[in-house]
Amino acid sequence: AFNEIAAKAKEDLGITMEMTALDSDSVVQKVATQPKAFDIADIEYWMCKKVWPIGNLQAMDTSKIANYDKIVGIFKNGKLTPTSTIAQGTAPHTVSFVEGANGKSFSSEETGWMTMIPTIYNADTLGIRPDLINRPINTWAELLNPEFKGKASILDISSIGIMDMAMVCEAMGEIQYGDKGNMTKEEIDKTIGIFTEAKKAGQF
């Protein structure tokens, strides 16, 4: 899709876009330390708290975003529907808005200045092969089910992987977190301990 975006930018704006593929940590490092090395940064929501306060990024005027009204509530107020529960962790809406074009502090509500536009809904966290399993998978606890020993894996982006691990531990009834996005040291140690033992047992 990125090649198509570059081609459309060339057609509509007359500019040639050069894409650079980087891993998540390298993106954070580049945005923080090399602001003149890029014009547009494709960052993820969890990165915002790390890089936005540095002041190397500029917010977008929502009045110039043609389809702003079509951006779902998850990114504006944290809710997909009026009765939705707001997510733990870095819920997108908590880092979606700042006070002005050059604002460094996040706003708790829409301000007309947006940090990021959602372009991709990732489905990379949990991959299931129903054609091989032949039964429903409806709980995160299945990730540590011995049935899948040697066939399971977790995401190697630590800020996301730790949240997946927490959902597994909670689903197993091993830990009840106060806030998975702001764990205590005890919660972190217990979570890592459970997965370390699973790794030693050959689950991953």
Model-found features: residue ranges?
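Early extracytoplasmic/lumenal segment of secretory-pathway proteins
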Residues: A1-I54
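Extracytoplasmic ligand-binding site segments that recognize negatively charged/polar headgroups
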Residues: N3, W52-F204
